[in-house]
Amino acid sequence: QMTVASDTQYEVTFRDVPVAATERVGTARGGWAVWSDVMHEGIILLAAQAMGGAERALEITVDFSKTRQQFDKPLGAFQALAHYMADAVTNVDGGRTLVHEAAWAAASGRPIAKLAPMAKLFACKTYRDVTAMAQQVHGGIGFTTEYDIQLFFRRAKQLQLSFWDDRYLEELVAAAVLDERRAARA
């Protein structure tokens, strides 16, 4: 059992469980293809969740930076913090577009072997980066359990670890890109 950000994960092991032929998913030795297809659709949903979290964490941070005063002016008036938030909103908007494209491709029956892992990689990295920046802008209160930003930060890490990790997603994207290159040369 592993718990990160209040999302408990369990492992279930089946041994010698009879399954009728009519109840089986896929063909004998063909389960990985079915599993992979389902996982690709699932990681698009996780990417959407990550982008929603990044967007909300950014909204909370922007509001905080407008109201929190330091040296008689709002935190958002400081150039360095404004640049952090500008970078964050750029990445959030770009990530949202990538996730929308992946979802559209999946819904349209188009190939998602590259788009789905790209969407999850980018969305989870964006979520993690936005929440790390948000904690910096919030200062000490951003790490306390009484304030929601810490939950967004923990959830970002949990989503990054869920389903396939960054390394495997990078391998999927690389394989898809290399396959495209080979097909273009043929």
Annotate each language-model stretch with its function.
Residues 62, 66-73, 89-122, 135-138, ...:
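C-terminal helix-coil-helix/basic helical segment that borders enzyme active sites and/or dimer interfaces
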Residues 104, 127-153:
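A glycine-biased, small/acidic residue-tolerant capping/turn segment at secondary-structure junctions
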Residues 141-186:
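Glycine-rich phosphate/cofactor-binding loops in nucleotide/flavin-utilizing enzymes
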